[in-house]
Amino acid sequence: MTRTARGVIAFIYLLPALALAQQLPRADRVPGGIALVELGVGADQPMPRVRYLDRQISVLNRDGKWLAMVGIPLDTEAGIQALLVNDKEIKFQVNDKEYATQHLTISNKRQVNPNEQDMERITAERVRINKALASWSNNDPLKRDFVPPVDGERTSSFGLRRFFNGEPRNPHSGMDIDGNEGDPIVSPGAGTIVETGDFFFNGNTVFVDHGQGLVTMYCHLSRIDVKPGQTVEAGDTLGLVGSTGRVTGPHLHWSVSLNQAMVNPGLFLPTEADTAD
């Protein structure tokens, strides 16, 4: 059973996925996870304005209630977090999670320690990436359940603490899915292409805005088959699996950004599809 907020500051119980309507990710209240928070307002009332860490949050009408879908950044510390809902606070708990480590060997040393010219390129690309991830449209981002973007084994999990050639680097901000060079990559849901290009680390990359701060990212493609401004539906081809950028072999790196926080893509897939060694 769910409970509504009482008073100006209230704790809200986060809903188990099975209690919710379809077209929602699974809740996992950890760094890199997702909080699904009932806002205590029926859908017969105006949609609440919700912010978290000074960012606009997705608000969905599910089962006649307004629900916030909140991406929790990977660097969030365990403890109490707060949503600003109109002029009130609603608090929720984030639990601790220890992610495993992964050691990779990269033959191209510049992909581990870029030179000055590389860093200039990386800095410029970061501006483009951040702009794409900050995209916002008012569409319902989950009109239907997501489908896997490529048919393959999940080979590297989200959140891994990574070491390249023995040197620590940023955590793994997506899911790696094995594939053969040239395998098709499809959009998991409806959306608009907001950015494409060849990036230093990510190689050939596509960004899809699904609505309300939900943006997906597809890296290391051998070929890009879409252009910015193009609309896509679930199952439409975005490009082909490749090995461009910083890779050890052909695969798809798939990232999901929610309110500009990288979250576990597996939470948007059926549990049987969310497996990795």
Predicted segment positions?
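Bacterial N-terminal signal peptides that target proteins for export
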Residues: 1-11
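Cationic-aromatic interfacial patches
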Residues: 21-98
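N-terminal signal peptide c-region/cleavage motif recognized by signal peptidases
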Residues: 14-18
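Conserved, short, structured surface segments that act as functional micro-motifs
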Residues: 205-209, 230-277
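Zn2+-dependent peptidoglycan hydrolase active-site motif and core
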Residues: 188-222, 250
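Short, well-structured beta-strand-loop connectors
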Residues: 85, 184-194, 223-241
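Cleavable N-terminal signal peptides
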Residues: 8-9, 19, 159
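Surface-exposed, glycine-biased beta-strand/turn segments
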Residues: 91-202
